[in-house]
A protein has these predicted regions:
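N-terminal low-complexity, Pro/Thr-rich disordered segments
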Residues: 1-38, 183-186
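Short, well-ordered beta-strand segments enriched in hydrophobic/aromatic residues
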Residues: 58-68
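Short amphipathic beta-strand and strand-loop transition segments with alternating hydrophobic
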Residues: 45-53
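A general beta-strand register signal
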Residues: 38-40, 109-110
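Surface-exposed edge beta-strand/loop patches
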Residues: 23-34, 123-186
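The feature marks short-to-medium sequence segments in extracytoplasmic or secretory-pathway proteins
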Residues: 54, 67-140, 185
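Extracytoplasmic
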Residues: 43, 55-59, 102-104, 145-147, ...
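Beta-strand residues in well-ordered beta-sheet regions across diverse protein folds
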Residues: 47, 61-63, 163
Length: 186
């Protein structure tokens, strides 16, 4: 990982107040949320039982159940990606889109008044930061269950909140929040 992520103390951070408003469904991580596509034909149910703390990072495994009319979800990455800036990555670096087009780079944690994106590394070939998460949610994934893995810098605390922002051009589609996710030590 690069200097863009710093190791933080793992003691609980003070509560900084309310979480930012979300435009999608909210539930505890273990209960999960069901998020419909913009057309409403497809939907994905997303759960996360816990995250695991290791050496200043948190590892999470999101369990997703896909329900698609045509037995595949051709745009599965939209439920997990960050497409706020066209042709760039979550850091806003030009050229980052090539490495992250179908990545799960929009899975953020909310802690201590901050939005924490996945940990990343500087890729020598792309010359841009690449997140430590699924990079290719393709080819089309058949209906059923799959696991999405992601690594975040550890903000400290005993629980975390996972938040996925809506894509600006899609309104509230694909937004959701999973709360009260327990942090387990490895």
């Amino acid at each position: 990982p690069t200097g863009g992520t710093t190791t933080k103390n793992t003691t609980p951070a003070p509560n900084s107040g309310k979480l930012p408003e979300t435009k999608g469904p909210v539930a505890k991580g273990t209960e999960g949320v069901t998020v419909k596509s913009d057309g409403g034909d497809d939907h994905v149910t997303i759960t996360i039982d816990h995250v695991t703390r290791q050496s200043g990072y948190l590892l999470g495994q999101l369990h997703t159940t896909i329900s698609a009319k045509k037995n595949s979800a051709p745009n599965l990455h939209l439920w997990f990606s960050d497409k706020e800036a066209v042709l760039s990555n979550s850091r806003g670096e030009d050229g980052g889109e090539e490495a992250t087009t179908y990545a799960a780079d929009g899975l953020t944690l909310l802690a201590g008044g901050e939005r924490i994106y996945p940990a990343d590394y500087l890729d020598a070939d792309f010359k841009t930061h690449v997140p430590l998460t699924e990079l290719a949610l393709t080819p089309f994934i058949k209906a059923g269950t799959t696991t999405i893995c992601v690594v975040w810098p550890d903000p400290g605390g005993d629980t975390v909140t996972l938040d996925h922002l809506p894509a600006a051009h899609l309104g509230s589609s694909f937004a959701y929040r999973l709360t009260d996710i327990p942090v387990k030590n490895s």
